[in-house]
């Protein structure tokens, strides 16, 4: 024997507990066969709407058994309940519950979306149903452009799009005029005649009289039932709750479409939400480009010094030297270090600031006393003239080699400066040559703002001191630089009898500078990341607001067959779309900022990685901060959601 289509046995539905307990349904037993036209009539508060919610699987009984074709509904998980609503029931609501932002056709298509129908099939089916219901020319009209009767016909088409076996009509004439009400009831009779089961919920006895069977409910109990006046269908259709919903790809594609529609519905709010993400992403791109540019520039300048240099400074390790005031390195130390194995050149150095004069031109520059090996160690070439020789150093001659900045401030034509005299410290110095330009140093100091004199001449005429501020050692074989550094350290330690000096190589300085620059980049990135975090909080806030504003829409989607995962996916995808759009705009604006900064002369380094990371972070932000709103949306109670204003 075939089980009845719908069977309720001793069903109760309680709300609240204790003194506040309300019995909306109290011991309801009911059987409805396939093909019946049943009206459930009762006044407000009688329990008829609660009964409809139970029949449509929007709610579960507190006690008792509700079965569809013998399958106990209480044993079904949420996904199978959603499938049951999607495949078996079609809802017609008193307030229509159409989505205001989409067309009549798209409203009709909603259940078909969750049934996994292809877009072309959905549209064809929706258009056909609307045409049969007299709305063929209003397929693309939005609900606000339709009359109440037309909106209710759209709701009927939505109920039929998945070939629903049971039509549940909840006060369908309540918001219609008498003419539209009669048209709707005629339509329900036609659907009944075609073999569908119709369950009509109403408070109006005249409306109920149009049904073949009338059940009256009062205070949660059935008080009368006119009985089944119609034979059940001989061949009952098979129960279809196990049918699967849309494929993941189709689900995501539809969610993306709905996300853009939702964002367009409130452009100003969307723009404000995107702004937070855009600021965060553009800040990440710009700041990392600035940080990387600064790091690359500093590293390039240090590397231009050559990887073969050792720097000897006076003072014990940890001692801070100021102005070369520590007298532990001498010219003899430099000469002795120059004799060590693998030392290509040992350059003694001492410097001061002084004013150079040429006629009416005065210029204050850095004056540095060095040996003839300075160009070798510093990898500097001559632009004009020659560098002074060892003989010049030994004879303490008054010669000077100028950087291009210094020469340009003293002479109108720097090429003609060679052979002329400048006054330095009150004494004349002949310009022996002009160095090739090198630009700024690692610290931003102009390396061409310099004047070089023989170290011996400087000690005698300018410095008034016989000790050095540094010795630079140029190593011949860089593979042995560590070994050479150790040898120089041991040599000076033996020579001085105490460790009153410090030796560092270019590699260690590079490592230290790189660490500092990396820390700077991390700091900049952290500041930008905080901006992105603030943007993410904005995304979560707006999505929570969206869930609150679209509660009824969520209820409609659940009633028409959306699973929890469908709702959750929809809101997560919306968050990802916000994050993605903000990421794209942020990357573009970030590159624009970088371009402007570069035009201002600041060094920047644009690489794909920061942009990819920033965009990925924006997507990740959308995902992370969209999870809570999405979960909240998917956990809404369908009945409460449909009842929300």
From Swiss-Prot:
Keyword rRNA-binding among UniProt keywords: no
Enzyme class, first EC level, given as a word: translocase
Subcellular locations according to the entry: Cell inner membrane
Residue ranges crossing the lipid bilayer per the database entry: 271-291, 520-540, 577-597, 608-628
GO biological process: response to antibiotic
CDD domains for this protein: ABC_MJ0796_LolCDE_FtsE
Signal peptide: none
Annotated function: Non-canonical ABC transporter that contains transmembrane domains (TMD), which form a pore in the inner membrane, and an ATP-binding domain (NBD), which is responsible for energy generation. Confers resistance against macrolides.
Name of the protein described by the UniProt record: Macrolide export ATP-binding/permease protein MacB
């Amino acid at each position: 024997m075939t089980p009845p289509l719908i069977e309720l046995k001793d069903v109760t539905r309680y709300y609240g507990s204790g003194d506040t307990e309300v019995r909306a349904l109290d011991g309801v037993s009911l059987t409805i066969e396939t093909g019946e036209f049943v009206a459930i009539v009762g006044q407000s508060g009688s329990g008829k709407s609660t009964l409809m919610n139970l029949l449509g699987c929007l709610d579960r009984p507190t006690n008792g058994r509700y079965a569809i074709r013998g399958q106990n509904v209480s044993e079904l998980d949420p996904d199978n309940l959603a499938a049951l609503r999607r495949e078996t029931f079609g809802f017609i609501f008193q307030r229509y519950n159409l989505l205001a932002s989409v067309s009549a056709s798209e409203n009709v298509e909603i259940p078909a979306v969750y049934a996994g129908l292809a877009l072309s099939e959905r549209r064809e089916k929706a258009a056909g149903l609307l045409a049969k219901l007299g709305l063929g020319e209003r397929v693309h009209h939005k609900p606000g452009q339709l009359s109440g009767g037309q909106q209710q016909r759209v709701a009927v088409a939505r109920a039929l799009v998945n070939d629903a076996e049971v039509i549940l009509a909840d006060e369908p004439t309540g918001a219609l005029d008498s003419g539209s009400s009669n048209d709707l009831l005629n339509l329900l009779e036609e659907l009944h005649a075609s073999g569908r089961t119709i369950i009509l919920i109403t408070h109006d006895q005249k409306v109920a009289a149009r049904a073949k069977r009338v059940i009256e409910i009062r205070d949660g109990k059935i008080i009368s039932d006119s009985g089944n006046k119609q034979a059940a269908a001989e061949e009952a259709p098979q129960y279809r709750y196990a049918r699967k919903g849309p494929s993941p790809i189709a689900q995501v594609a539809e969610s993306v479409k709905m996300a853009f529609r939702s964002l367009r519905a409130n452009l100003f709010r969307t723009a404000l939400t995107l702004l937070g993400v855009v600021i965060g992403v553009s800040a990440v791109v710009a700041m990392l480009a600035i940080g990387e540019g600064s790091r690359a520039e500093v590293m390039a300048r240090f590397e231009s010094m050559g990887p073969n240099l050792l720097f000897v400074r006076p003072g014990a390790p940890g001692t801070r030297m100021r102005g070369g005031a520590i007298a532990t390195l001498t010219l003899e130390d430099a000469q002795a270090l120059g004799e060590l194995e693998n030392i290509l050149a040992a350059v003694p150095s001492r410097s001061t600031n002084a004013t150079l004069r040429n006629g009416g031109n005065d210029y204050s520059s850095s004056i540095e006393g060095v040996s003839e090996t300075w160009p070798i160690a510093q990898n500097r070439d001559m632009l004009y003239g020659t560098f002074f020789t060892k003989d010049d150093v030994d004879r303490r001659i008054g010669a000077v080699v100028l950087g291009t900045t210094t020469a340009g401030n003293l002479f109108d034509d720097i090429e003609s400066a060679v052979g002329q005299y400048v006054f330095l410290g009150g004494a004349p110095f002949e310009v022996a040559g002009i160095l090739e330009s090198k630009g700024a140093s690692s610290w931003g100091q102009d390396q061409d703002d310099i004047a070089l004199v023989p170290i011996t001449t400087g000690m005698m005429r300018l410095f008034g001191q016989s000790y050095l501020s540094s010795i630079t050692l140029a190593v011949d074989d860089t593979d042995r630089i560590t070994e050479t550094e150790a040898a120089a350290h041991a040599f000076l330690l033996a020579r001085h009898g105490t460790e009153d000096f410090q030796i560092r190589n270019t590699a260690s300085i590079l490592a230290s500078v790189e660490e500092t620059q990396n820390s700077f980049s991390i700091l900049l990135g952290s500041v930008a990341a905080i901006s992105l975090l603030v943007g993410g909080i904005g995304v979560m806030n707006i999505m929570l607001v969206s869930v609150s504003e679209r509660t009824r829409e969520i209820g409609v989607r659940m009633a028409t067959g959306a699973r929890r995962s469908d709702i959750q996916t929809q809101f997560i995808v919306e968050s990802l779309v916000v994050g993605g759009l903000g990421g794209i705009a942020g990357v573009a604006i970030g590159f624009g900022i970088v371009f402007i900064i570069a035009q201002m002369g600041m060094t920047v380094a644009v690489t794909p990685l920061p942009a990819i990371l920033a965009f990925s972070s924006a997507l990740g932000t959308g995902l992370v901060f969209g999870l809570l709103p999405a979960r909240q949306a998917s956990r809404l109670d369908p009945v409460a959601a449909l009842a929300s204003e």
